[in-house]
Amino acid sequence: MALQLTGHHDQEVLRARLSLALNDPAGMADLMPDAPGAGVAELARYQSLFDTPLPRFAQAPRSPRHPLHPNALGPGLAGASNAFAATPARAASSGALLANDPHLGLSAPSIWYLARLELATGGVIGATIPGMPVILAGRSEHLAWGITSAYLDDIDLYVEELNPENPQQYRTPDGWAEFRTDRRVIEVAGGQDVTITRAWTENGPVLPGQHFDIATVTPPGSVMSMAWTALSDQNTSIQTGLRLMRAQTIEDGLAAGEDFVAPAQNLMLASRDGRIAMQMIGRMPWRMNAHDTKARMPARGWIADNRWQGMTLYFANPRFIDPESGILGNTNNRTVARDFPLHVTHDWGDTQRITRLSRLMEARDVHTRDSFIE
């Protein structure tokens, strides 16, 4: 699911390819504009970051570009999840209302299954993914919750320069370092076993060049690695689901989100006592202002300022509690103002859906379950 809900590596590769192809750097803003009001500095030319020349028009490999979805049409296909809530002041009933329709790619069998779990604290019902003992979007006697993708920029690609005298080493801020490697045997039914060697740098695992078209933007004598929050060996995201099912108040629900790592989500909450809230959950990488591609293209992995400096604290994530309007909604849209001090993403969802949702929500003084279905 985390791989389905992130596309920032695709965007980095696409921006780098455009930078190589365009004679006019300003053309990038026409073809891949930043979100209105983003205030992002102009990018350096991708080729200027490296001493070795890259082809201006590199041909993409013929093998499937996506390792898990070989028939995918290509990058840039946004999801369309929606979540919205209303307080009792804006509802015909005496309680708060919450609706959610999380969207993922079409698959067979289906990803989502409706289930009811009986806990010591009471029953919980909602959407589950087989194999995960939690309700990811649903309700208990005390609380309802839903999710939309936050589009958090949780991936960075890094160009790792190989030691020309020893290809088992790569360049770091402190000199050459050995790749961390292991060998795995893949058993093939009806065929011969396949042995692969995996390699890691300090930034993350090394990716095969045919994946995500990264070979087209990898300089000669280099490989590409990936830093991604979902690869954390301390991923406690499942704890958020377990805590939500036992939560009894808005405060309990917000606190549960602190355990979440990836994929980043906007958690929408509505409580039995009529309160509503929304919090972005998921670890947000801490990047330096001196990052030479601003996380919009692959960066040089041996430059210390390009590397992640850890993760921001949970309380810094965008949060909205009991708005005066009595209405909350999210359609993967931008959730922070331009002066928000941290980098969340360069690629928010579209504005059409949130505009329509806002219009529909404000068209009524009070809402019902039926109006939410509309």
Role assignments for model-derived ranges:
Residues L104-L117, V159, I238, A247, ...:
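Short active-site loop/helix that positions an aromatic residue
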Residues T121-T201, L242-R246, W302, S358:
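Compact, glycine/acidic-enriched structural inserts
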Residues F50, I214-Q239, L244:
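Conserved, charged catalytic cores of large soluble enzymes
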Residues A83-T87, P133-A137, Q265-A270, R275-A277:
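Short beta-strand scaffold segments in enzyme catalytic cores
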Residues L20, D34-A38, R56, D233-Q234, ...:
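Ordered core of a single globular domain
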Residues V13-R15, S94-G95, L106-S110, A115, ...:
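Short helix/loop capping segments that flank catalytic or ligand/cofactor-binding pockets
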Residues M1-L97, P102, A108, G126, ...:
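Substrate-recognition/specificity elements adjacent to catalytic centers across diverse enzyme folds
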